[in-house]
């Protein structure tokens, strides 16, 4: 797709070739935010795949990832096509880009619901679980940038990040993550958090 921020157009292509995925591969890709699969945009779903799955109205963040995780149970085949099919406009002043004092709580709730789903449906599958922990660690890094170090955060310091890293769900994700499917800069940051917080 084309991502448009103000007047700048950036073509986003996560993979160059067409690819076919089974249910597990789709779920693993959905749990890795840097693949782009966890978002609900960029997709066309067969109505039978969606079935009775709906967005969780109790979540304010992460509801799209949970939706993708839940429909993965109904997927027999997913096909990726590396073509620009639409324009995705980014609103730089949107609500998700503003400082939110409840940011950590919103992500914690989403992580708790995600964990419950993954453990109930894939608790014995190590490959799924490690990707879930990587998903959690990735979101701790988002919290570090968008909350702990946000210019409007009055607690803006390492203490804020330490508090976040000591929340059990986040601590577990950091500890059990394996650096897979994240960029080098995020790997370095995650390594620092794992060994210094």
Locations of regions flagged by a protein language model:
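General small-molecule cofactor/ligand-binding pocket signal
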Residues: 79-81, 173
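Catalytic core of nucleotide-sugar-dependent glycosyltransferases
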Residues: 83-92, 97-123, 139-170
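Solvent-exposed aromatic/hydrophobic patches embedded in short alpha-helical segments
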Residues: 44-45, 135-141
């Amino acid at each position: 797709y084309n991502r448009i921020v103000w007047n700048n157009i950036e073509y986003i292509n996560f993979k160059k070739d067409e690819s076919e995925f089974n249910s597990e591969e789709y779920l693993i890709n959905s749990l890795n935010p840097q693949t782009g699969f966890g978002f609900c945009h960029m997709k066309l779903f067969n109505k039978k795949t969606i079935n009775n799955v709906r967005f969780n109205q109790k979540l304010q963040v992460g509801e799209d990832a949970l939706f993708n995780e839940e429909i993965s149970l109904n997927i027999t085949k997913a096909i990726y096509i590396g073509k620009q099919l639409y324009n995705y406009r980014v609103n730089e002043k949107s609500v998700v880009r503003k400082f939110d004092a409840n940011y950590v709580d919103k992500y914690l709730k989403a992580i708790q619901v995600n964990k419950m789903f993954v453990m109930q449906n894939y608790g014995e599958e190590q490959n799924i679980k490690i990707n879930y922990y990587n998903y959690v660690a990735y979101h701790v890094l988002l919290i570090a940038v968008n909350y702990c170090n946000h210019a409007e955060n009055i607690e803006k310091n390492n203490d804020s990040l330490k508090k976040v890293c000591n929340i059990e769900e986040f601590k577990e994700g950091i500890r059990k993550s394996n650096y897979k499917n994240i960029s080098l800069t995020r790997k370095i940051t995650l390594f620092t958090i794992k060994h210094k917080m």
